[in-house]
């Protein structure tokens, strides 16, 4: 397993509400946890150096939760059907940098139409319209990181 993959896993763990993550690739495995356990050690020698700082920012995780709670009252202002991110990842409006965007504001969409891509761990996940309607707003900029359940679009 490549150290870059381990670093990406740590970043995803920090960005999400997950407390522990274990990945197995063939005979190799790595376990990353927000809470240190002396019995469970990652296979990689470098991994503990990266896993230890993850436990330290745990109190800081309360601050984004408080910020999310403060911004929660703004959520009811969204009109129509709100399409939310099903995962933590990176938001892309098009299949590639040279491709046209999947949708634009004011465009009509049908249930099942692809609205965007959320990339998570090098996997491109198509996000589809849950209802038919018109794109009222696009709430995220292309290439920006998104959180689980973050609003991406409104469809009216």
UniProtKB/Swiss-Prot annotation:
Query: Which Pfam families is this protein grouped with?
Result: Biotin_lipoyl
- GO BP, one example? fatty acid biosynthetic process
Report which residue ranges the record marks as coiled coil.
Answer: none
Q: Which residues carry this modification: N6-biotinyllysine?
A: 122
The residues covered by the Biotinyl-binding domain are: 80-156
Q: Which InterPro entries match?
A: AcCoA_biotinCC (IPR001249), Biotin_BS (IPR001882), Biotin_Carboxyl_Carrier/Decarb (IPR050709), Biotin_lipoyl (IPR000089), Single_hybrid_motif (IPR011053)
The protein's assembly and partners: Homodimer.
Recorded protein name is Biotin carboxyl carrier protein of acetyl-CoA carboxylase
């Amino acid at each position: 397993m490549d150290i870059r993959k381990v670093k990406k896993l740590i970043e995803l763990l920090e960005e999400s509400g997950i407390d522990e993550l274990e990945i197995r690739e063939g005979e190799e495995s790595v376990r990353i946890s927000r809470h240190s356990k002396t019995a469970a050690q990652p296979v990689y020698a470098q991994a503990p150096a990266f896993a230890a700082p993850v436990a330290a920012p745990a109190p800081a995780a309360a601050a984004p939760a408080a910020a999310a709670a403060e911004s929660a009252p703004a959520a009811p202002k969204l009109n129509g059907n709100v399409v939310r991110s099903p995962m933590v990842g990176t938001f892309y409006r098009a299949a590639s940098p040279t491709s046209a965007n999947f949708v634009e504001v004011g465009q009509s969409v049908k249930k099942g139409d692809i609205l965007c891509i959320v990339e998570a761990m090098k996997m491109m996940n198509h996000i589809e319209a849950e209802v038919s309607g018109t794109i009222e707003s696009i709430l995220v900029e292309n290439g920006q990181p998104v959180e689980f359940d973050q609003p991406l679009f409104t469809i009216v």
